[in-house]
Amino acid sequence: MHPETEQACLVPSSKKTKLCSENFEDKFSSLLESVVSIILSQLPTAEAVSTSVLSKSWKNIWTNITDLHFDDTKQRDPSDSRFTDFVERVVGDIGSPHISSFYLCSVNTFDETLLFSWLSKVLKRNLQRLVVTCNDLEIISFSSLFPSFVSLVELRLRTKSILDISAPAILPNLKFLSLEDARIFNMSSVSKNLVLNFPVLETFEASYCRCFRTDTVIIDSPLLRIFEMFKCTSEHVPNPSQVCKIRVLASKLEKITFCGDEPRKIHLSFPPSLPDAYLALSRSEWPKTFLRSFTCVTSLALVLSKDFHVMAVPKFSQLVYLHLIYDMTQHFRLMQFLKSAPILEMLSIRDLTSPRSTPTAKSLKELRSVESPDCVTTMLKVLQIRNFKPNRLQISVLRYVLDNAEILGSVILSSPNPITEEEKARILAFPKASPHASVLFE
C-alpha cells in the first residue's frame, strides 16, 4: 500500500472521535475520486459498497470501482436471496465504463438467467478477467456470450456449462483459459474439426470436459507454454475409430499435464520440441500410439495405476529425467521404461504399493535376475527414491540399481519418517558398481 494511502486508512475506531480531529487528519478528502475508486476496487465488493454510509460524499463513489468480487461460500442457504439481490443491485448501479474483472463464487443454487444477465452487462464494458465458480447450478449455455469474450485476458469457468461453436473460435486477447465440466459442441455443418484460435494464450486447462461431434480439435496457440487436461473425454465422434484427435499447435510449449482413464477416446498430438510431460494413466490398455506422442520429451513424470497396461513402450530417445510413480511389486513396469530410455541420466521413483501387499520371494528374485538395461549400466547418474521405506521391496530396487549402475554418482533416499542409524549403516554397506556413488538420506 502507498504510504499516503496507508496513513489515510488510520482512522480511529471510536465513535466519539471526529474524523478530522487535531490528532487525525482526513487524508481521503484530499485524494482524487479516481484514486479512491482504485483503492475501493482492491476490496471485496461488499466492503466497497459499505463505504457508502460514511458520508453523503461517499454515497456513490463505490459505483466507479472496476473490479467486482462476489463470494457467498460462507453462507450456504439456497432460500436466502440476499446474495443474488446484492449482485443484481451492484451490476445494475455500477457506473464504470470499463470493468477489469468479474469474480463470482457461489455454493448456492439460483436462477441461471440471473448469471446470464450479469455477464451480459459486464462483458459490454471491455471486461478482461472473468471467473465463475458455481458448482450447484444446472447446465448453463454460454454459447451466445462467446462472441463477447473477445476482450477477455483470463477466463475461468468452473460450472456445468455448454459451449456451442459453429466456426473457428478466435479469442485474440486471451492468455489464460480454464474450463471445468464444460460440454463443447461442434455445431458446424461444414467441418468435423473444431478450431480454437488463441494467438496469445499462455495457459490452457481443461478438467472433466466433454467434446461432442468432433473429429479433431485444433488448438492454435503459438505462445502456449502450459497445457493441462484432467479426465476429459469425447462422445459421438464422427469417425469409425470413435477417437477424437487433439492437435496442439504451439512451438513454445513447455509442459504437458495429462490425467486420463479412457485410453481409446482421445489421441494427443504435440510439437516435437515439447520438453516436459506429466502423465497420470489408469485403467485398461493404453495404445502405443498414445505414448508415442510424448517420445520427444527430455523430462517425463508418469503415475501408473496398478491396472494400467500397455503392450509396448515406444522409444524415448531424448529422455534424460524420468519420475515414475508405480506399484513396485510390478518390477516389469520399471524395466519397460528403462529399456526404452537409452540416454536416461536421472531416475526418480515412488512406490504406490498398497500397505497390505507383500512382495513374494519369487518376485524379488526375478528382479535380481533381470538383465540390466544399457541406460542403467552406462548412463544413470542419479537415483532418487521418494517416500522411501527400508522394506524388502524398496531395498531390492535400491540394490538392483547399486549393483548395476557403473557411473552412478548420487543416491537420494527421501523418507517421511526418520531412518534408524542401524538401517542407514546397513544401506551404506551395500556393494556398489560405481566407486563414486554416495548415499544421501533426506
Curated annotation (Swiss-Prot):
Q: Which domain of life is it from?
A: Eukaryota
Question: PANTHER family under this entry?
Answer: F-BOX/RNI SUPERFAMILY PROTEIN-RELATED (PTHR31900), SUPERFAMILY PROTEIN, PUTATIVE-RELATED (PTHR31900:SF30)
Record keywords: Cell division included? no
Q: Where is the F-box domain?
A: 26-73
Q: What is this protein called?
A: F-box/FBD/LRR-repeat protein At3g14710
Q: Where are the LRR repeats?
A: 126-147, 151-172, 173-194
Q: Which residues form a coiled coil?
A: none
Name one matching Pfam family. Answer: FBD
Q: Which InterPro entries match?
A: F-box-like_dom_sf, F-box_dom, FBD, FBL13/AtMIF1-like, LRR_dom_sf
Q: Which UniProt keywords apply?
A: Leucine-rich repeat, Repeat
Please verify whether the record's keywords include Repeat: yes
Q: Where is the FBD domain?
A: 370-414
